UniProtKB/Swiss-Prot annotation:
CDD domains from the UniProt entry: Hb-beta-like
Organism: Aquarana catesbeiana (American bullfrog)
Positions contributing to heme b binding: 64, 93
PANTHER family reported for this sequence: HEMOGLOBIN FAMILY MEMBER (PTHR11442), HEMOGLOBIN SUBUNIT BETA-2 (PTHR11442:SF98)
One of the protein's GO biological processes: hydrogen peroxide catabolic process
Classification via InterPro entries: Globin, Globin-like_sf, Globin/Proto, Hemoglobin_b, Hemoglobin_oxygen_transport
Function: This is a tadpole (larval) beta chain.
Family annotation (Pfam families): Globin
Protein name: Hemoglobin subunit beta-3
Domain Globin, residue spans: 3-147
Amino acid sequence: MVHWTAEEKAVINSVWQKVDVEQDGHEALTRLFIVYPWTQRYFSTFGDLSSPAAIAGNPKVHAHGKKILGAIDNAIHNLDDVKGTLHDLSEEHANELHVDPENFRRLGEVLIVVLGAKLGKAFSPQVQHVWEKFIAVLVDALSHSYH
């Protein structure tokens, strides 16, 4: 179990209050597909992902980005049991979707970029440090069901 200080929880929640789950989720998934194009292979049902413009304009990318940040929202509301909160999602990605768990780390990286761009100077090194810890906890929780 991860120990969160009251200050860390406050930092996570303070940043999260500024997040637009729909817009920022779309931005994060769009970035993932553009920066790491091989991650698109898990999304063959999404249709046209042939260019940055096609990815950015794809309604399925938009909807799935929102869904991803919705799961992160759930984890933030359950910081003391992120692994338990994301257990079913981990099982699904490991056993049904067969997603390479390294992609969770990549998604975390692009989310950090999205948050940094959105918050500017407010995303200080100290804030980033807390968010890097949170992303590591997310990645660990989502990777838990892999053998």
